[in-house]
Amino acid sequence: MIAALMRPPAAGENEERWLERAREAEARGPLGLHTHWTAPDHARPTAGDPAALVREQGDWLRAVGLDVGFFCGGGWYLDEDVAEAVAELGYTDCTATAFKPGYLEPDAAHLQLDEPSWLQLPSGRRLLELPTTHSIGMLARGLLGPFRRQVVHAYFHDTDLLDRRRSAALRVGLGFLGTKRTPSNLEELQRGLRPTKTMSFANSGP
């Protein structure tokens, strides 16, 4: 099942239209927060307090009546304070990846995990981490081999659906994946998955 992790409307964007789309997505499957800190077209933070914006957006989503349960930081950004904010909001995090995005600098804030894990935070909270394991290209390249990870969690952007080639690759990749693994969704994993691995966020940096 597809989960919609959505960026809240930026200044000047049509909030009513956004809410209409978000409620439609919520009716179809799990809903999550996808924060872009700098601008709609610039995901990773360049200034300010990243965790404060996550809390602000999470509070707004709750105030407008949306049932949000997941988070993915734009540009795969996650630091300790953001992780604390995500845990405070009661979300499950999907920002970690099983791969290192090629555009990130070596010292960029990013969490890399192969399998689901609990993140032990300085506050004493634990955050359930369901890492993203595959891009569209990785799904397509893996068709002829086994998917060895406990959970296969692929991501794509809505703009990928407008590209004929990428949309076709996504459909083929998901179709083959469905023949090899048992379909699930993030809410089922959130409720039922209990990872055996717990790690300190302080020891999970790049």
Which residues does each PLM region occupy?
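A structural signal for short, well-ordered beta-strand segments and their strand-loop junctions
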Residues: 1-2, 30-34, 70-73, 85, ...
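Short, surface-exposed amphipathic charged segments that create phosphate/polyanion-binding patches used
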Residues: 47-49, 108-113, 196-206
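Short, well-ordered coil/turn elements that cap or connect secondary structure elements
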Residues: 26-28, 88, 124, 178
